[in-house]
Design a protein with these regions (language model features):
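Transmembrane beta-strands of outer-membrane beta-barrel pores
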Residues: 12, 23-29, 59-63, 72-78, ...
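Transmembrane beta-strands of outer-membrane beta-barrel proteins
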Residues: 17-21, 66-70, 98, 111-113, ...
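Outer-membrane beta-barrel translocator domains and adjoining extracellular loop/strand segments
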Residues: 29-38, 78-86, 124-132, 137-138, ...
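Outer membrane beta-barrel strand-and-loop segments of large Gram-negative receptors
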Residues: 1-7, 42-46, 50, 147, ...
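Conserved C-terminal beta-signal and adjacent last beta-strands/turns
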Residues: 100, 241-364
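Outer-membrane beta-barrel signature, preferentially recognizing the C-terminal barrel domain
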Residues: 45-48, 88-91, 119-173, 191-204, ...
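Face-selective signature of the C-terminal outer-membrane beta-barrel domain
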Residues: 1-82, 105, 109-110, 163-165, ...
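Residues on the lipid-exposed face of transmembrane beta-strands in outer-membrane beta-barrel proteins
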Residues: 4-10, 53-59, 100-104, 154-160, ...
Length: 364
């Protein structure tokens, strides 16, 4: 991976105008060797050039702040198998992504309304055509013909004292779904892969959080709901997956004398649908930690128990064409950890920029 990024800003018309560019080049080899010959060994290569240009203008008025931006992305994707260029799976994408936001203060309430168009590109493992052996009934592979997901998002947010609120409505095009298809006539073998969903998927999310400070206690309570509108084909009938799911988290820290800090974090999520998966039970966890600092916080020792009630277990159903998967996962995440940390050099970095190629690193 090679990446470079440049941003220039200047005053213009009472506001600030910024232009920039980011270029990344990625070369990835993906070799899968199966000596038992359950599936054929395969050797693939991906080369991707991503060139981006963007411009943004910000200006403040007595009645509010405006921000306007436009981003252009050019992506050249080349796919190779056994060092041979595969033309039908190599593509070029050119997209424009605008964004606009307006923020103002209504009394004591700070509000913002924003519209953003953005993309989520598939991970490189999702783009690999190598076939992986899961078990005697299941094979798995990526899909080099995947298109990037395009998201149009409209968000209204507000803040008052220690309360924050967010309402969001989005339309997602070409969402990448995990999908299963039967390989042979007797339905004994299934190929799991990824596919783009051709129809646009609406989604609504709402979150409310509170972050007060009460003496030595700093609680953070957050509740939210997410609902999608999605109907998939399932054994030649339509399966509607529009069940909303609710989440809640309650994180707490207590700063005590003598450098002690106690943390108590909890999370819970209800049953509900996300993409073509339905989680059919509520799950969550509780974590507890105690931290002691020494030497003006240069040295710290932390004792932490994760999932102390052993409740982080999920079960879900996946609906995809002629394939149905029910999976129950009981992760062994109940653990006790001891962390000793010493800060050798606490001087702040003078570097003021942002990292180039961060989105590409996340796709690796």
């Amino acid at each position: 991976l090679a990446a470079g990024k440049l941003t220039l800003s200047m005053p213009l018309g009472g506001g600030t105008f910024a232009v920039g560019s980011e270029v990344t080049y990625t070369h990835r080899n993906d070799d899968y060797i199966n000596e038992e010959n359950y599936v054929p060994s395969s050797f693939s290569k991906i080369e991707e050039l991503n060139a981006t240009g963007y411009a943004e203008y910000n200006r403040s008025f007595p009645w509010g702040d405006w921000s306007l931006g436009l981003r252009y992305e050019h992506v050249k994707f080349d796919y190779y198998e056994d060092d041979k260029h595969i033309d039908e799976q190599s593509r070029t994408f050119d997209n424009f992504f605008p964004n606009i936001s307006f923020s103002t203060k209504l009394g004591a309430v700070q509000t913002q309304l924003s519209y953003t168009a953005k993309t989520q590109r598939p991970s490189y493992s999702q783009l690999s055509n190598n076939v992986y052996y899961s078990d005697r009934f299941t094979l798995q592979k990526g899909n080099p013909t995947l298109r990037p997901t395009i998201i149009h998002d409209l968000t209204l947010s507000g803040a008052w004292r220690f309360l924050q609120m967010s309402l969001s409505y989005s339309q997602t095009k070409d969402l990448i779904l995990f999908w299963g298809e039967l390989v042979n006539d007797d339905a004994s073998l299934t190929m799991l892969s990824n596919r783009n969903w051709d129809e646009s998927i609406p989604m609504f999310t709402a979150f409310l959080s509170a972050t007060p400070k009460i003496g030595c206690w700093s609680p953070m309570l957050s509740v939210g709901v997410q609902k999608q509108w999605l109907t998939v084909d399932y054994f030649k009938v339509q399966k509607t997956l529009d069940n909303p799911f609710f989440t809640a988290s309650f994180n707490n820290t207590w700063e005590l004398p003598l450098g002690f800090m106690i943390g108590l974090d909890s999370y819970i999520q209800s049953a509900g649908a996300t993409q073509n998966i339905y989680n059919d039970k509520t799950y969550g966890y509780v974590n507890l930690s105690v931290r002691k600092s020494f030497l003006n916080d240069a040295l710290s020792v932390e004792l932490k128990g994760n999932d102390i009630f052993n409740t982080n277990k999920i079960s879900y159903s996946m609906y995809s064409g002629d394939y149905y998967l029910y999976q129950k996962s009981a992760w062994d995440r109940q653990e006790f950890a001891v962390t000793v940390r010493y800060k050798f050099n606490t001087a702040k970095s003078k570097y003021k920029g942002t990292g180039a190629g961060d989105s590409q690193k996340n796709r690796m």
